[in-house]
Every structure is written in C-alpha cells, then in structure tokens.
Regions:
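Extended beta-solenoid/beta-helix repeat architectures
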Residues: 1-231
C-alpha cells in the first residue's frame, strides 16, 4: 500500500510499499522497496538498498545504494554509501556517491561527486568531480560550470557557451581532465594532458598538452595545443 510520513517513522527491518511520501523523518534499518514513487521533502535514511520506480527528492535521502528504474528528480540531497543505478535522473541539488553511478540519462544542474560515472547521455551545467572515468555516449557541458574528471570517454563531447553566463574572468578552467577520448570533441575552457579524437576543435580558454587526431584538428580563438599529432 501507500506509506505517508508527516512526523517520524522507524522500521526495524525492510519496508515494501507501492508509494512513499515523507515530509517528516523516516529511518529504515533494512531495505526500501517501492513499486511506485518515493516523494521526500523531509529526511529518509535507509540502511540497505533504496529501490523505487520513480523518485522526487526535495529533502534528503541517504541509503547504502540507490536504484531508480524510472525518473529521478532531486532538488535536495541524495547520498549513497555504495553505487547508484538510475534511469533518467536530474540533480539540481546535490548528489554524492561513494560507489559508481550508472544511468541512462543524467543531468547535473547542481553538484555531483562520484568515483566513476557511466551514462548514455550526460549533461551538466553545475559542478561535478569524478575521480575516475566519465564514460558516456553524448556529453554536453555548459561553459558556466566547473567540472573535474580523471578520464573521459565518449562518442561526442561539447563544451557549449551558456547564453545566460557572461565570463568576467574565471578562477579556473570549466573542464579539467587527465585524458579525453571520443569521435567528435568541441572544447572550450578545457585543460587536459591528452586529447584523442577523430574531429577535434580546441577553442577559447583551452590548454591541451597533446592532441592525437585522425581526421581533423581545428584550433581557434586563442586555444593552445602544445603538441598536435595526426595518427
């Protein structure tokens, strides 16, 4: 059935339900399994896995691992001591995972921190720090954000100018990575040791130590490539 929490709830074992609405505080000592939507404007803590079809978090959710097969919208806080398995997710609040994140589509308008991320489509306009690999088919990054990744693998990556952001002098590059590899790469405000691609465009604010390209390399608007190599 449906569970509503407006004050406080403590469950010593697992909680199974069709829907969960929490505007108060819920603590589940086992796992949470929800066949429908979990809606949280309060606080939910789950000792084991939190699994749901849909999720809408404006409060805080913390679990050992998070699994959402459908759509997840988080304007609050989502934390996982393990990994996250997501369908289509949008974080305008904060997302922190100590394990890897796997998603079909991931949009970061707030902040994200994870060891590694894999997605079919990845879009960011906020802040992220990915210690290891960001692997996605299509990556779009707004120039107004701040992004750090160990390595990036993709089919296409575009750093695009945000029409609503006027650069008045940056503290640091928009994107920093050790290596970036893909078919089509369009870079702005990017610092990387190695960039590998078929079609590579290095634009304003870029400092790239080495570019290895197979088809075409374009350097424009003051972008810097220290060592271009056609492979």
């Amino acid at each position: 059935g449906e569970v509503r929490v407006s004050a406080s709830l403590r469950v010593d074992g697992d909680l199974r339900c069709d829907a969960l609405q929490c505007s108060g505080s819920a603590k589940i000592e086992g796992a949470l399994s929800c066949a429908g939507e979990v809606r949280c404007s309060g606080s939910v803590k789950v000792a084991d896995e939190a699994a749901m079809q849909e999720g809408r978090f404006s409060g805080s959710v913390k679990a050992q691992s998070l699994h959402c097969t459908g759509t997840l919208q988080c304007s609050g806080s989502a934390k996982s001591e393990g990994g996250m398995q997501l369908g289509k997710a949008r974080f305008s609040g904060s997302c922190a995972a100590e394990g890897d994140i796997h998603a079909e589509e991931l949009e970061i308008a707030g902040s994200l921190r994870a060891p590694a991320v894999e997605a079919e489509r990845f879009h960011a306009s906020g802040v992220f720090r990915i210690d290891g690999l960001l692997n996605a088919g299509e990556i779009t990054l707004s120039r107004g954000g701040l992004y750090q990744a160990g390595d990036i693998g993709c089919t296409t990556l575009r750093v695009v100018q945000d029409a609503h952001v006027i650069s008045l002098g940056r503290r640091k590059r928009a994107l920093e990575a050790q290596s970036i590899e893909g078919d089509t790469l369009e870079l702005l405000d990017t610092q990387a040791a190695v960039v590998r691609g078929r079609f590579v465009c290095v634009g304003a604010g870029c400092v790239i130590d080495r570019v290895e390209y197979s088809e075409d390399l374009t350097v424009e608007d003051g972008g810097i490539v220290k060592e271009p190599v056609r492979c």
